[in-house]
A protein has these predicted regions:
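Conserved catalytic-core segment of nucleotide-activated headgroup transferases in glycan assembly
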Residues: 2-74, 134, 169-175
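A short acidic, often aromatic-flanked loop/helix-cap motif at beta-alpha or helix-coil junctions
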Residues: 6-11, 91-94, 139-143
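Short, structured coil segments at secondary-structure junctions
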Residues: 55, 78-81, 112-116
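Short, conserved active-site loop motifs that form the nucleotide-linked donor/cofactor pocket
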Residues: 57, 81-84, 131-132
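Nucleotide-activated donor-binding/catalytic signature segment of Leloir-type glycosyltransferases, i.e.
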Residues: 72-87
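A donor-sugar binding/catalytic signature common to diverse glycosyltransferases
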Residues: 88-131
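C-terminal amphipathic helix plus adjacent low-complexity
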Residues: 142, 148-214
Length: 214
């Protein structure tokens, strides 16, 4: 049974049926993962600083809680009339006001794509047609402009991607899970066979992210 992800129930309940038009001025959500090998925060910092000072766009910056404290402090110091540094616990709260997201390889970008709004990524580890992925800093501003124009082919890819990873958009995933549990118990279900530890997979993932804390 396909249930969906309960975490997204409230999120889907708040989404409008139609994608709202781009705001004036547009609102850009910038988010970066904490892994030093995957994060583009330091690389794109000068561009975020420069673009936030032009006044053409509004920026909301939020960084992973485990991000290097010095990097967090640098971005927080950028706050001005056009840039807000947000420390909300749940990044989903920022999605509705944003017209697009800029990121790198953060898991949050897949969730943002479920709003059917564009994402610009820098050196994404798994780029695809649903993203505008760049590898040069000088392409950052042009990529944002392209995303804000919402080209039809990109928007179609975003919609296809969203339908593939979470086709159920009614905000009732938790209800389906509870129904599935009740049905499983009613049919005399027993605990499934324990999954293997997958220690090698976990080791490779931690090594790739250079993350060894428990």
């Amino acid at each position: 049974m396909e249930t969906g992800w309960p975490k997204l129930d409230y999120f889907f309940q708040q989404l409008p049926e139609q994608i709202p038009p781009v705001k004036e001025p547009p609102v850009i959500l910038y988010h970066s993962t904490f892994s030093p090998s995957w994060s583009a925060a330091e690389i794109l910092y000068p561009e975020v600083k420069r673009l936030s000072q032009t006044g053409e766009w509004k920026w909301v910056v939020t960084l992973h809680p485990k991000m290097n404290p010095e990097t967090r402090a640098k971005f927080k110091a950028l706050e001005n009339d056009n840039l807000v540094f947000s420390e909300v616990d749940n990044i989903l709260e920022l999605f509705s006001d944003a017209d697009l997201m800029c990121s790198d390889t953060s898991s949050a970008l897949s969730e943002f794509l479920l709003t059917q709004k564009p994402v610009v990524t820098f050196n994404n580890r798994r780029p695809g047609p649903q993203l505008i992925n760049i590898s040069r800093v000088e392409d950052f501003e042009p990529a944002i402009r392209t995303a804000l124009s919402r080209p039809a082919d990109l928007m179609a890819e975003i919609k296809t991607f969203g339908a593939a990873i979470h086709p159920l958009r009614d905000g009732k995933s938790a209800e389906r899970i509870l129904d599935a549990i009740d049905d499983f118990i009613a049919r005399g279900g027993k605990n499934a066979k324990p999954k293997p530890l997958n220690l090698w997979r976990k080791f490779k993932l931690r090594r790739a992210m250079n993350y060894w804390k428990r």
